[in-house]
Amino acid sequence: MIMFCVQCEQTIRTPAENGCSYAQGMCGKTAETSDLQDLLIAALQGLSAWAVKAREYGIINHDVDSFAPRAFFSTLTNVNFDSPRIVGYAREAIALREALKAQCLAVDANARVDNPMADLQLVSDDLGELQRQAAEFTPNKDKAAIGENILGLRLLCLYGLKGAAAYMEHAHVLGQYDNDIYAQYHKIMAWLGTWPADMNALLECSMEIGQMNFKVMSILDAGETGKYGHPTPTQVNVKATAGKCILISGHDLKDLYNLLEQTEGTGVNVYTHGEMLPAHGYPELRKFKHLVGNYGSGWQNQQVEFARFPGPIVMTSNCIIDPTVGAYDDRIWTRSIVGWPGVRHLDGEDFSAVIAQAQQMAGFPYSEIPHLITVGFGRQTLLGAADTLIDLVSREKLRHIFLLGGCDGARGERHYFTDFATSVPDDCLILTLACGKYRFNKLEFGDIEGLPRLVDAGQCNDAYSAIILAVTLAEKLGCGVNDLPLSLVLSWFEQKAIVILLTLLSLGVKNIVTGPTAPGFLTPDLLAVLNEKFGLRSITTVEEDMKQLLNA
């Protein structure tokens, strides 16, 4: 059987077809796993439909609320490639749905849910049979009837909500829960399960998802800073230190904290990778002296870089790609919702097996000459610099701020972001976040009267900090955010980037430039609508874009 998936930037796009629709997607996901993820999403939509009904009776099931976004997160790009675990999530979704349904019926014997996913049952234990069942839920199954524009808007909402679900799970791990957010999530998820076909309603839904995600990012920020302190500027070594070692990748700061606690005094050093880099800025994480540095570059280079790393690797969230290519599948471990067939999975927070493996390996034989980069410009630090920024602008020392961030990826066109960063004039500042920073974060940019010209605000979810800074600057200057000498140049790859974009648009931020390509699910008509409403456009050339943005 074949798949249909168009959720990430590397999806197949030719004049003849749009989306991965073969035995395997460009990310390495098999048709089986992709189809079973469609089945899981349908089961989760049915679960959300009953969660909405339950709230009408005052029933709030926290097991349902915590499980639903977490399981949805498993379908995000480069997270879980393990078909049996995907089916396990679907079975758990149905079991939770039936329990919730029973709670509703106990209150009202006539309780019913009008949703096509509300009574979904898996037809078999056989993966092949389940894959055939999943064909009923392929996202483009009614494309001929509804057209490409409606399909594209459905997918914009589905993928945006998927990105928000990932942030909800990150926040939940840190003890953050907001009933209003979960109620809104279930309402949207259930509605998408009805296969809506009204263009205006779908556009409104996409903005609702963006607004909801702003609240999600707020509680995630509260969770991270509440547990680990507010990030402050910190130098991080990106070269090797002699000794045994573990590499930890992803976004989960709690996993990193637990690993640091458990490795303390063992002689094993810990390195961050990818989106874990901003962890070095948090006081409660950097206090561990054996958190010695950051290793590697963008996630797309992991098959080469992980093969060279002389210790075990822990993946806490996206992004994982085929570890058999570099033959390190025997020393990569997955956590939480991450999965790869044949790779060892850590069900809990006990890293002793990983530590034991690290102690058996050689580690780095010598320390390299340090190369230090600076991270840790969190929300509090950024707000503390607001008056300095305004003063520099008023004295014409600072002409413009570029928010240059987002996802990294493998396309050669992404060199645009390196070229853009190095072309930014000396009287302008670069604010960056997410893994797109690896395109330029080891370059030297100097400063403006002591203020670094490259300011690393953190992970992708730390777009929240950048938004708060922009709002604060606008308030202090008595203008709107769109009137600031501020331009957003964003790179996208997967669904977290999609929901960040929806968040910005829902807040009224205009004239965002994105690349390296437009999402495959957005038709020319939809791109025209977004351009007309928000001024959203794709990158062109560095020279043209720089000229236009500086003169805006």
Curated annotation (Swiss-Prot):
Gene Ontology annotations for the cellular component aspect, listed alphabetically: cytoplasm
Keyword terms: 2Fe-2S, Cytoplasm, Iron, Iron-sulfur, Metal-binding, Oxidoreductase
Keyword Metal-binding listed: yes
Cysteine persulfide PTM positions: C407
Catalytic function, reaction form: A + NH4(+) + H2O = hydroxylamine + AH2 + H(+)
NCBIfam families: hybrid_clust (TIGR01703), PRK05290.1 (NF003658)
Name of this chain's protein: Hydroxylamine reductase
Organism: Shigella flexneri
